[in-house]
Design a protein with these regions (language model features):
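PLP-dependent amino-acid enzyme catalytic core
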Residues: 1-304
């Protein structure tokens, strides 16, 4: 057995995710234009999403600074993937994890968080993430735990600057021309764009946003909703709006035509990448497949 194939811990398996070229969706048009569309499979991370990276980073670095220690209670407001990733990271590092989120999250996410040992507090869906964040802040003020605050924590985009961005650059051998990401906490797009723009300012950075009246899990419409403090708009060249119907249709197409079992926000980013591909030539367009489709089975996006 080759020892270099053995990871010392599960946290060492986070990152270095595959970058896969789409083969069928838009194939004829892409071949004609000389474009390549690539999906970075962040669902391959141990807890199943791109959020594994910042979750572990926020806990590790807070611990290194002496802000927290194993056995402490951590608090976070989250709509899903960050909660699952934090639950895993807290289990690895020995923390009690309390997650606060709107009550309309999918049952798969809630069950997964509990499987990792996290405690859940559900808030009224009418209050959205703002209500959940306010409650987390109140609990911290009352001394009930330490809030990691993914929306304002610089360790969130920093880990994408240090890992996700360099991986994309290396995997494309510097040929990447466009980067597309859904925008939730904005940690991914902020960190990756910062790295890629340093490498090549000509690389276009595109954020996927829900169109008016659409609700896509994992994507929030900024600045109509709470604008994260970590968001750096200076490196984002364009926002493209995707409807819920188009995102869900692309979700099904990715599974059936490419064999990529992606979540709805990932499919929204793919849809945006396809729109960009219709406007350019000889481009290498990468998008983040931020999680897997099994977290959305109860939503009805996939036919029974």
């Amino acid at each position: 057995m080759n020892s270099h194939l053995i990871y010392p811990t599960i946290e060492d398996a986070i990152g270095k995710t595959p970058l896969v070229a789409l083969q069928r969706i838009g194939a004829a048009d892409n071949a004609k234009r000389g474009n390549v569309i690539l999906g970075k499979l962040e669902g391959n991370n141990p807890a199943g999403s791109v959020k594994d990276r910042p979750a572990l980073s926020m806990i590790q670095r807070a611990q290194e600074r002496g802000d927290i220690k194993p056995g402490d209670t951590l608090i976070e407001a989250t709509s899903g993937n960050t909660g699952i990733a934090l639950a895993m990271a807290a289990a690895i590092k020995g923390y009690r994890m309390v997650l606060i989120m709107p009550e309309d999250l999918s049952i798969e996410r809630a069950q997964t968080m509990k499987a990792f040992g996290a405690e859940l507090i559900l808030t009224p869906k009418s209050g959205g993430m703002e209500y959940a964040r306010d409650l987390a802040e109140r609990m911290q003020a009352e001394g009930k735990g330490r809030m990691l605050d993914q929306f304002a924590n610089e360790d969130n985009p920093r880990i994408h600057y240090e890992t996700t961005g360099p991986e994309l650059w290396e995997q494309t051998q510097g040929r990447i021309t466009h980067f597309v990401s859904a925008m939730g906490t904005t940690g991914t797009i902020t960190g990756v764009s910062r790295f890629l723009k340093e490498k090549n300012p000509a690389i276009r950075i595109i954020g996927a946003q829900p169109s008016e009246g659409s609700r896509i899990p994992g994507i929030r419409k900024w600045p109509q909703e709470y604008l994260p403090k970590i968001y750096d708009a200076s490196n984002v060249d364009e926002l493209v709006y995707v409807s819920q119907d188009d995102a869900e249709d692309m979700c099904r197409r990715l599974a059936r035509e490419e064999g990529i079992f992606a979540g709805i926000s990932a499919a929204g980013a793919c849809w945006v990448a396809m729109q960009i591909a219709q406007q350019v030539e000889n481009a290498t367009i990468a998008f983040i497949v931020c999680d897997r489709g099994d977290r959305y089975l109860s939503t009805g996006v996939f036919p029974a």
